[in-house]
A protein has these predicted regions:
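Compact, glycine-rich, soluble single-domain proteins
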Residues: 25-154
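Bacterial N-terminal signal peptides
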Residues: 9-19
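Sec/Tat signal peptide C-region and signal peptidase I cleavage site
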Residues: 20-24
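Bacterial N-terminal signal peptides that target proteins for export
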Residues: 1-10
Length: 154
């Protein structure tokens, strides 16, 4: 009887603690996708909207992926008549606000891909925040045409 009681207690404890340790609160990802890559190309980009419903300011400091050696936050900016991409070390998302990673603006650059990303696959992204909390999301890989169609639905 004590083994059954201890097992139930452990299960209840895990159910209570698991949500606290695996996500950053009420962060919502929408319109997310990663661009498919042709053979021989070792980088791609991810686009999504990240909504902060936590009631607290969140500062995104890093992103990692199961498919890329490195994920960098970038911002495209016009410098005169040339578009330039610059690295961003952190992004602040106010309570109740959303942040858009989208073509032509901020985006997530996935580099060091060992294999091409094929439409229909999924890519796991793990967001790390300044307070040490994390949030994981699995995004679909879309070909360029499907990704453009999805952007039109935003």
């Amino acid at each position: 009887m004590s083994y059954r009681y201890n097992g139930c207690s452990l299960l209840l404890l895990l159910c209570v603690l698991l949500p606290v340790t695996t996500n950053a609160g009420e962060l919502v990802v929408s319109q997310g996708y990663v661009r498919a890559t042709p053979p021989g190309v070792s980088s791609s980009a991810a686009y999504l909207t990240l909504l902060n419903e936590t009631g607290k300011r969140r500062v995104l400091v890093a992103v990692t992926s199961d498919r890329a050696k490195q994920v960098m936050m970038h911002q495209n900016q016009w410098q005169g008549d040339m578009m330039q991409m610059r690295h961003v070390s952190q992004l602040e998302i106010a309570p109740g606000a959303h942040f858009d990673f989208e073509p032509g603006g901020y985006h997530l650059m996935l580099t060091g891909l060992a294999q091409p990303l094929v439409a229909g696959e999924r890519v796991l992204l793990k967001f790390a925040f300044q307070r040490g909390d994390t949030y994981e999301v699995s995004l679909p890989v879309l070909d360029v045409g499907a990704a453009m169609d999805m952007k039109g639905q935003h």
